[in-house]
Regions:
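Short glycine/serine/threonine-biased micro-segments
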Residues: 10, 28, 69, 92, ...
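A short catalytic or substrate-binding loop motif that flags glycine-/basic-rich loops and adjacent residues
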Residues: 12, 88-90, 112-113, 152
């Protein structure tokens, strides 16, 4: 499918896979020649997951080449409808909706961080790119509406009420917001 690493992170999956397969007439349906599952940790982002997959893929390629050389490459048919085929992502898919859960926002940001386009929110008609956030699990602000700027931490850090908890902006484009404002 399209954007498999981004989708795996954005959906909060606990694992993904590196798969080599023969091309055929349909999307991602050819016979599999190598597949390795990889765990996705809470700390993983687009960059770290990409490196994990690439490291495994290098090992897989060596094994595939050795098996080809020995004429021992095994092909495994894929189950019809057994894999995930995700749709193409658009710009709106990267927009932070503060009504989302803190985990969903965290997952969205880590999925779209550099080298990708970044998650974003709109403040005073300006798109603000967000590269890293921290999830703060607390019941202290349960009765505050999502999107409220709760506090300023350091030079650029803001704590913002999410649907269920709090999100701290750790790394984002420069923006000046006031405590009490709503996004």
């Amino acid at each position: 499918g399209r954007h498999p690493l981004i989708w795996a992170l954005a959906l909060g999956l606990e694992s993904t896979a590196s798969t080599f397969f023969y091309m055929d007439a349909h999307a991602d349906t050819g016979e599999i020649v190598s597949q390795r599952e990889l765990p996705i940790s809470y700390e993983d982002d687009a960059t770290s997951l990409y490196h994990k997959v690439m490291n495994v893929a290098v090992d897989q390629l060596e094994e595939i080449m050795n098996d080809l050389e020995k004429n021992m490459l095994q092909k495994i048919p894929q189950e019809i409808g057994g894999g995930n085929v995700w749709r193409k992502r658009g710009k709106r898919d990267g927009e932070i909706d503060w009504r989302m859960s803190s985990r969903a926002i965290y997952n969205l940001v880590r999925a779209l961080t550099k080298p990708y386009v970044g998650a974003h929110f709109v403040y005073q008609d300006q798109e603000i790119k967000v590269w890293k956030v921290r999830e703060i699990i607390t019941k202290e602000y349960d009765y505050i509406e999502p999107g409220k700027v709760l506090s300023v931490t350091g030079q650029m850090g803001y704590r913002i009420k999410a649907g269920d908890n709090v999100i701290e902006l750790v790394q984002c484009e420069p923006v000046h917001m006031e405590i009490g404002e709503y996004l």
